[in-house]
């Protein structure tokens, strides 16, 4: 009885969690649509300024970026190895600039004698030798120099360096002070993005799937990873958040990120906030840097534009790999992903890797499963005595509970022992869920036949239905201590309820649960057979 009650409590919390997430997403979606309508007629791009300048294109084998010569900002970035949608011929556009949506990576030289003044909308108008640059197959990197000369004759060179197969962009500055003046400048980098997405970029789905984090984040000397949702930034004035040598600022979304990594040779101030035209901003500026008369200095920073590939991001900057947001169960999701990635390197298929990791998890938890069935068998053996206690004290529920607990203590039976494995599986299940919906490696990753994307739902619902069948079979062959007909009826509906929920879950997660159920059936037969021999 206690075992079944604990099981129902577990099911209650699981269903409550899913319903809460769904309600939260519906509220979020409603708010988003309201704010989108408010801003839909706002022109987010200053067309008068942009008409004065032209753009240049820089292309490698993995990146294609568009740089506006007015300021030298990156206004568009395509990830050539990632498609916008499954089976689409169009590359994914991460950074973009149009009338309804802005997502830019800005950088420059500001300060008392700098070329850039964002507050007054003053930017240098750079010149380039040509409009299109492409990395050849025989070269490992490409350098694209831009140049601007101030009215005082100070020469500013802004150089973009892109490498073959890499998503980090180096931005270098060479400032030649030919004057007799002592200059003070600061280097800055900023990311800005439309807070509320227009309809064509809103990936919200109205089902039970959990939504991943979208917002801004930073890392510093003292904090490895701090994040801000866009909801917490909207209508907030810019404020300095930390002064640090090391670290980065970033904007995050599902599977992809952009991040400025400043030069840690200088002390940098990081800031965050929003402007009045529906834009969130996060960035940094360095402490004032001296440029003496008739001298040249070199400055640099790095920009990550691409997928959240953890091992590559960790090389670019310390803690940058933490932008892969696994939620509150990150301490389980991270080792699970490392194990899954290790298995993938062996077998070359993410679906097979999920099957293998299921075998490993079920093998590790087998002692708990065995303990669960032992506890259930002991409780069934005590059922006649429990029924006698209920009959003897039928008008005194408190006495019944006391006598049953006394019986468990005498017989050395822990009624919670049968439910413990269920509680162990829940965090593993959720950790695997967050891993599957947050790891870019599984985006559009095929398994076999009709499963072309393990991070998305099964298009034909075959896996959820099979999972429901295995769950129903487990329920039928598992010896039960339930005697109440109402509870029995409710138990019969549990597989159906779970099948409905799993229809919209990532197919990789449903595959895990299906294989887990199949392994459970085999383990169950082995354990029950051994217990029957022991209890004879």
UniProtKB/Swiss-Prot annotation:
It comes from the Bacteria. It is found in: Cell membrane. GO terms for cellular component: plasma membrane. Keywords: Cell membrane, Chaperone, Membrane, Protein transport, Transmembrane, Transmembrane helix, Transport. The keyword Cell membrane applies. The chain crosses the membrane at residues 3-23, 346-366, 417-437, 454-474, 494-514. InterPro entries: Membr_insert_YidC, Membr_insert_YidC_N, YidC/ALB3/OXA1/COX18, YidC/Oxa/ALB_C, YidC_ALB_C, YidC_periplasmic_sf. One of its GO terms (biological process) is protein insertion into membrane. The keyword Protein transport applies. GO terms for molecular function: membrane insertase activity. Coiled coil: none annotated. It is a multi-pass membrane protein. Its main location: membrane. It holds the Pfam family 60KD_IMP. Interacts with the Sec translocase complex via SecD. Specifically interacts with transmembrane segments of nascent integral membrane proteins during membrane integration. Belongs to the OXA1/ALB3/YidC family. Type 1 subfamily. Required for the insertion and/or proper folding and/or complex formation of integral membrane proteins into the membrane. Involved in integration of membrane proteins that insert both dependently and independently of the Sec translocase complex, as well as at least some lipoproteins. Aids folding of multispanning membrane proteins. This is Membrane protein insertase YidC. It comes from Buchnera aphidicola subsp. Baizongia pistaciae (strain Bp). The gene is yidC.
């Amino acid at each position: 009885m206690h075992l079944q009650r604990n099981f129902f409590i577990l099911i209650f919390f699981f269903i409550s969690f899913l319903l809460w997430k769904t309600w939260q997403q519906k509220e979020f979606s409603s708010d988003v649509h309201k704010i989108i309508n408010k801003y839909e007629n706002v022109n987010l791009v200053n067309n008068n300024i942009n008409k004065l300048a032209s753009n240049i294109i820089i292309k490698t084998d993995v990146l294609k970026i568009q740089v506006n010569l007015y300021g030298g900002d990156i206004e568009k970035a395509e990830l050539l190895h990632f498609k916008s949608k499954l089976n689409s011929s169009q590359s994914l556009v991460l950074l973009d600039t149009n009338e309804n949506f802005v997502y830019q990576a800005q950088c420059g030289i500001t300060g008392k004698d700098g070329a850039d003044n964002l507050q007054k909308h003053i930017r240098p108008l750079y010149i380039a030798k040509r409009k299109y640059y492409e990395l050849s197959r025989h070269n490992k990197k490409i350098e694209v120099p831009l140049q601007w000369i101030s009215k005082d004759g100070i020469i500013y060179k802004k150089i973009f360096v892109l490498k073959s197969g890499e998503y980090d962009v180096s931005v270098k500055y060479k400032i030649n002070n030919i004057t007799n003046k002592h200059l003070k400048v600061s280097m800055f980098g900023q990311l800005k993005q439309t807070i509320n997405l227009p309809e064509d970029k809103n990936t919200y789905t109205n089902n039970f799937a959990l939504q991943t984090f979208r917002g801004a984040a930073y890392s510093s000397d003292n904090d490895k990873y701090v994040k801000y949702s866009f909801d917490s930034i909207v209508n907030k004035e810019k404020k300095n958040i930390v002064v640090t040598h090391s670290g980065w600022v970033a904007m995050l979304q599902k599977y992809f990120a952009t991040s400025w990594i400043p030069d840690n040779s200088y002390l940098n101030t990081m800031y965050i906030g929003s402007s009045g035209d529906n834009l969130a901003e996060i960035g940094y500026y360095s402490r004032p840097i001296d440029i003496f008369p008739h001298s040249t200095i070199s400055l640099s920073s790095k920009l990550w534009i691409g997928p959240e590939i953890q091992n590559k991001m960790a090389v670019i900057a310390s803690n940058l790999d933490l932008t892969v947001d696994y939620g509150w169960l990150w301490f389980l999701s991270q080792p699970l992903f490392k194990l899954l990635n290790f298995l993938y390197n062996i077998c070359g298929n993410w679906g097979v890797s999920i099957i293998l990791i299921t075998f490993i998890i079920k093998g590790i938890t087998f002692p708990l499963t065995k303990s669960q069935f032992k506890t259930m068998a002991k409780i069934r053996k005590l059922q006649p005595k429990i029924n006698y206690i209920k009959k003897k004290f039928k008008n005194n529920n408190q006495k019944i509970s006391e006598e049953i607990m006394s019986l468990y203590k005498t017989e050395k039976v822990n009624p919670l022992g049968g439910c413990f494995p269920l509680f162990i599986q829940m965090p593993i299940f959720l950790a695997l869920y967050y891993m599957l919906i947050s790891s870019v490696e599984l985006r559009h990753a095929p398994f076999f036949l009709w499963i072309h994307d393990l991070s998305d739902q099964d298009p034909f619902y075959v896996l959820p239905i099979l999972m429901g069948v295995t769950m129903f079979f487990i329920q039928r062959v598992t010896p039960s201590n339930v005697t109440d007909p109402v509870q029995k009826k409710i138990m019969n509906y549990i597989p159906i309820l779970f099948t409905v929920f799993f229809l919209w879950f990532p197919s990789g997660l449903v595959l895990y649960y299906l294989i887990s159920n199949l392994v459970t059936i085999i383990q169950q037969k082995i354990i029950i057979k051994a217990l029957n021999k022991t209890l004879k």
